[in-house]
Amino acid sequence: MGEYTLVCPCSGKTVPDHYTLNCDCGSLIRTEYAARQLTLRNLPGMWKFYDWLPASGHTDTPGTTVTYRSEGLAKELGIDLHVAFNGYWPELGADMKTCSFKELEAPPTIVRAKEHGGKAMVLASAGNTARAFSYLSTITGFPLIVVVPKQNIDRLWIPGREPGASVKLISVGGGCDYTDAINLSNRIAALPGMMPEGGAKNVARRDGMGTVMLDAAVTMKGMPDDYFQAIGSGTGGIAAWEASMRLRADGRFGSKLPRLHLAQNLPFVPMLNAWKEGRREIIPERDMPDAKKSIAEMYSDVLSNRTPPYGVGGGVFDAMKATDGLMYGITREEAVAAKKLFEAREGIDILPPAAVAVAALVQASEKGLLEGRKVVLNVTGGGQERLMKEVPIYQVEPVLEVPGPDVPMEEILKVIA
């Protein structure tokens, strides 16, 4: 198994693992694995990185990142580029049928929850995370209660099979967004027998996403100089940083941490606003005034989070500082153009968040920031348009629609009991 201890990054103290999500100082707990060097295992999909995943068992799921050297986009931009592709692309060997790298979070998180005696998991999502966890719940039968804003429930589908009875979808209407869904999910998670998924605080989620960097480094035989990703909460950026530190300690993949290039989608860019002013703290009235209106205007609203793990110890701010990172604000027009460019040069469709990352890559290359450097672009989701033509999909229907996060718990209990 991936033998590990949990450690507070600020105090260095070991934290007992009871599906622990918090330490005393509020920092993001990290895993320290007994295996200091990475050994690839003969296991399905992402589980080849078993030694650096916080679980004893594994799932029989094929989803994993596939990293390849770009030709078309690399030539267009004049850079040395590898693409870490997460999605559905059979010719490439990419078989992530929910078409999002959230499928890297769900398997270790659900396995970890089961191993710690969890009876049911509760999570909130704007779409992609809910889809990945619902898929894994359907495969494993592990009970899942997922809370999603009403305008996003069309994103909640299962590839290749009917949704399992283990999945209970609650839709939050009334103009509610992802943060409202989080607030309701937190209330449900406080009920007896319920286990919160944990978001960025859950080491299984972060270490699952961190396998993107592991796959890139193994494929390239060394860590990249630069790493590009679009962010909503920023958890993927944190995960890439943490994985890089493990690779550095391994000793075979280089000693310099990759520079993080993290992109937010205008007009909702609270982390970018705080970062530009050198602040660890996000000031809501300054960094995200009229947040719901801004979120409604985004090209990719899954990249919205009003309470991201930015200033917390071991969070986005620390990751950016440690890697001399850069942050970008991408417009709708830039993202749309980047999506067309990638698809024309690489030959596969990509989801809107990935297009935001491509747009940041274009900006950086045009500024000459990537000359003579080895670059990784994390395509966090792709191949969905193709999958829809080749694989039957089944919509997950809500068991309950509520007007907002303050709904009486009696209504919730009727449908989740």
UniProtKB/Swiss-Prot annotation:
<dbReference type="GO" id="GO:0003941">
    <property type="term" value="F:L-serine ammonia-lyase activity"/>
</dbReference>
<dbReference type="GO" id="GO:0030378">
    <property type="term" value="F:serine racemase activity"/>
</dbReference>
<feature type="binding site">
    <location>
        <position position="380"/>
    </location>
    <ligand>
        <name>pyridoxal 5'-phosphate</name>
    </ligand>
</feature>
<comment type="subunit">
    <text>Homotrimer.</text>
</comment>
<dbReference type="GO" id="GO:0070179">
    <property type="term" value="P:D-serine biosynthetic process"/>
</dbReference>
<dbReference type="InterPro" id="IPR036052">
    <property type="entry name" value="TrpB-like_PALP_sf"/>
</dbReference>
<dbReference type="GO" id="GO:0044686">
    <property type="term" value="F:cysteate synthase activity"/>
</dbReference>
<feature type="binding site">
    <location>
        <position position="128"/>
    </location>
    <ligand>
        <name>pyridoxal 5'-phosphate</name>
    </ligand>
</feature>
<dbReference type="GO" id="GO:0018114">
    <property type="term" value="F:threonine racemase activity"/>
</dbReference>
<keyword id="KW-0663">Pyridoxal phosphate</keyword>
<comment type="pathway">
    <text>Cofactor biosynthesis; coenzyme M biosynthesis.</text>
</comment>
<dbReference type="GO" id="GO:0005524">
    <property type="term" value="F:ATP binding"/>
</dbReference>
<dbReference type="InterPro" id="IPR022401">
    <property type="entry name" value="Cysteate_synthase"/>
</dbReference>
<dbReference type="Pfam" id="PF00291">
    <property type="entry name" value="PALP"/>
</dbReference>
<keyword id="KW-0808">Transferase</keyword>
<protein>
    <recommendedName>
        <fullName>Cysteate synthase</fullName>
        <ecNumber>2.5.1.76</ecNumber>
    </recommendedName>
</protein>
<comment type="similarity">
    <text>Belongs to the threonine synthase family. Cysteate synthase subfamily.</text>
</comment>
<dbReference type="GO" id="GO:0000287">
    <property type="term" value="F:magnesium ion binding"/>
</dbReference>
<feature type="modified residue" description="N6-(pyridoxal phosphate)lysine">
    <location>
        <position position="102"/>
    </location>
</feature>
<comment type="function">
    <text>Specifically catalyzes the beta-elimination of phosphate from L-phosphoserine and the beta-addition of sulfite to the dehydroalanine intermediate to produce L-cysteate.</text>
</comment>
<dbReference type="GO" id="GO:0030170">
    <property type="term" value="F:pyridoxal phosphate binding"/>
</dbReference>
<keyword id="KW-0174">Coenzyme M biosynthesis</keyword>
<dbReference type="GO" id="GO:0019295">
    <property type="term" value="P:coenzyme M biosynthetic process"/>
</dbReference>
<dbReference type="InterPro" id="IPR001926">
    <property type="entry name" value="TrpB-like_PALP"/>
</dbReference>
